[in-house]
Amino acid sequence: MVYPEEPFWVLPTVTGFYEDRDYRVNVVEALQEFWQMKQSRGAELKNGALVIYESIPSNSQPYICFVTLPGGSCFGSFQNCPTKAEARRSSAKIALMNSVFNEHPSRRISDEFIQKAVQDARTSFKGTSQINEGTESGIGAFRFMLEANKGRTMLEFQELMTVFQLLHWNGSLKAMRERHCSRQEVVAHYSNRSLDDEMRSQMALDWIAREHDNPGVIRRELVLAERELETFRMAGRELRFPKEKKDILMIAHNQLGGSALNSATIDD
């Protein structure tokens, strides 16, 4: 499946926001209160308004923290943070900025939004060897998903978006297409599923099978996912997709009983 790039997923830079000096707002509290307010005003948040933080285990700086918002979007600390608390504040800061910007009418899925998004998705493959039946089918599924979620904002749509990105990456969409499953059936099924440990474990099993057929494929994919995740994190971009790819591949790697892999892998 293919997806548009800017301006749909990337937040424009706001001068001064990233500077720590004279920044007196408690961004961690402000972020939680923002989503609680949205819920109280009627926003449909199937998993509630809780903002979830995940600190990466480390005995030395820079510390890294990820934050997942109620709609499924994920952001990471984008600065070199000397403490775990600062890493949490850094991740909350970029997430709060995106949450506020997400309220702008341009972030709401509309007919005009869908037309532009699909056009950009198709243009991103124009003139390349990647245009094929699968690409066109992916674009069609992308349009169908957007049309089924009119009126929602992009952050509220993010978890479903990530699920279908993972299904495409994992080869599951192709397999369902070969079984003649309709777009409506696939979207309806996964719209009611959460991106949880069960789904990750199922995808990890697929990668374990691939590893048996093609030794080293998990490590190669993990290198790519690590690089993408680090690039997105330092740029302050939404990063749920690369983070989930890394988590799924690590589950597969650990189940195979392989040797430890860490961030040094990305230098290979």
Swiss-Prot record:
Keyword Membrane: yes
Protein name (record): Protein limb expression 1 homolog
Gene disruption phenotype: Viable and fertile. Wings are slightly shorter with a decreased distance between cross-veins.
Subunit structure: Interacts with ft (via intracellular domain) and ds (via intracellular domain).
Family: Belongs to the LIX1 family.
Topology of the protein relative to the lipid bilayer: Peripheral membrane protein
Name of encoding gene: lft
BP-aspect Gene Ontology terms: autophagosome maturation; imaginal disc-derived wing morphogenesis
Function comment: Component of the Fat (ft) signaling pathway that functions in normal development of various organs such as the wing and leg. In developing imaginal disks, involved in regulating both the protein levels and apical localization of ft and ds. Involved in establishing planar cell polarity (PCP) along the anterior-posterior axis of the wing (the early Fz signaling event), probably by acting upstream of ds and ft to regulate Fz activity.
